[in-house]
Amino acid sequence: MCLSLGQRCGRHSNCCGYLCCFYDKCVVTAIGCGHY
């Protein structure tokens, strides 16, 4: 199961496809999200 845009995420949760976890929220990878 993956998390959608804007959902809270953590070290052990995965955001869906093109999203990544940034400051505890799933955001679009293009914004830039460190190396997660």
Curated annotation (Swiss-Prot):
GO CC term, one of those recorded: extracellular region
Annotated keywords: Disulfide bond, Ion channel impairing toxin, Neurotoxin, Secreted, Toxin
PROSITE patterns with a match to the protein in the record: I_CONOTOXIN (PS60019)
Location(s) in or outside the cell: Secreted
Expression sites by tissue: Expressed by the venom duct.
Keyword Translocase annotated: no
Superkingdom of the source species: Eukaryota
InterPro entries linked to this entry: Conotoxin-I_CS
Major subcellular site: secreted
GO MF annotation list: ion channel regulator activity; toxin activity
Intrachain S-S bonds: 2-16, 9-21, 15-26, 20-33
Similarity annotation: Belongs to the conotoxin I1 superfamily.
Domain-related comment: The cysteine framework is XI (C-C-CC-CC-C-C).
Protein name as annotated: Conotoxin Bt11.4
Lineage: Eukaryota, Metazoa, Spiralia, Lophotrochozoa, Mollusca
